[in-house]
Amino acid sequence: MKVTGIASCIVVGLAALAASYPANAQKSKDTLRHTQADNIAVLDQWIDPRPEVEFNSEAAYDSIVGYDDDKGAYVGILAKSWKRVDPRILEFELHENVTWSDGEKFDADDVVYTFNWVLHPETKLRFKEAYTWMEKVEKLGTHKVRIVSKVAIPWDLARLSSQTFILPEHAHGPLKDKQDFGRAPVGTGPYRYIQVDKNTGLIAVKRDTYPQASAAKPAPTIGRLVVTPVGDTGTVTALLLAGQIDIARNIPGDQANMLAGRPELRLTLREAQGTQYLMIDVIARSGKKELTDPRVREAIMAAIDTDPYLTIVYGENMNAKRPAALCSPNMVGCAQSQKFVTHDVARAKRLLAEAGLGAGFEVSISAREGTGKQIAQVMAGQLRAAGIRANIELDTFATYRDKQRDGKLQLLVSGYAGGGLPDVAQLLNFFFAEDPRNYHGRPEFFDLAKRANLEMDPQMRLNLVRQLFDEVTKMHYIVPLIPASNVYVHSKDVKFREGWPSNGYGFTMSEVSWQ
């Protein structure tokens, strides 16, 4: 295994620091310790939808349904069964033996209350539009509800399964300031949070019973969770080496591989639905006319080699693979048959010569700090090897959005987290909505995306998505580069479940166990 000198020095230095801490394995205390980059004052993803809040909320709260990624099927969580009465109506039979973490019983009133609160005109939520497809939610019995959508959509279950956590009417309803709820959360989830502190972190304990356990959300096995806010990778690594935490997320590839060489640590790659991708300005909104020639775009695709991107981001020995399609294979509605261009520098040069650009041309790659910058730096060298003189423009998120809106992106290396849905719908909205992201100039792409997001017949929907993604690939517009996987360095005592991920982190807390 190759490790850079810098990474080696970092690990050696941190190992020396770790020696000053007493190793303190927590398996014997049935306590799993990990860190988060953000300070969390309110554990409620409705109020604060940051990824780390959503991840920890998964342990506290439940959705009506979940998604079994391995089988590609929806399964009940708070619902024990459901039926589609007609294309616009879903009816759910709810579990009758579920309790809230304060001991009160869960019932249909809680479901109706949650969605009525979310949809109320005075409720201000960042992602409220994700639920405006609902027309109404009705109580049909003590443990039966009906959800009616405004129009027939094939992804309603996907939205209901994805961080759509149900709230307790008795605890949430009376609060004038709804942020107070997340400071002392009450949920039906597998863990009960006994501490939510912005400075010291989160503490949760396993619920005594979890009768709604399913393949999408199994019953917990670890007794106690301790989550500490730590903002920098160096401190996280030091705590890991000192035995003060059991899991560390997304330590840089070289460093993670070297840490995993220690006998007390292991390395695990957990895939997620997102991707880092390359987008080309097909219609020269940026004024870069050379990019309108499909031979030039194909040359760019042939010049890039994704293997070094995988290595630099995830390190060696991780077996990370380039995505085979624009969508993840476990997404409902994902379909693509057109293959991506393979790496071939000689072919890239021939294509440029055929396009009258044998002497090459200049192009700008827009990227942001982090993974995007890492990939862009390697990509620029690959393009230069084919005769394309690429320079890198590093953007903040704000400047990137300005450039996107103003038509100033030539090549874009960026990331997309998958939208949090086990369905292709959000991906279609992200890439093919009629907004400033349009650098393709193909009205039929908008039409195909809209039709796919309204088509109720599964096979017809797959055909629409396949047609769209195949055309996108043929015109060399967008191509995925690496998966949005998560690298975990963890104690040898920690075990992740096998199979596909349940969320953007690659696991939920109830899916972790001791070896």
Model-derived features: positions:
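Surface-exposed binding/hinge segments that line
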Residues: 21, 26-27, 83, 128-171, ...
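Alpha-helical secondary-structure segments
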Residues: 33, 107-114, 142-148, 189-190, ...
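Acidic-aromatic pocket-rim loops
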Residues: 48, 278-279, 324, 399-454, ...
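Structural transition elements
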Residues: 191-192, 287, 320-354, 372-374
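Long beta-strand-rich cores associated with HINT superfamily self-processing modules
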Residues: 488-515
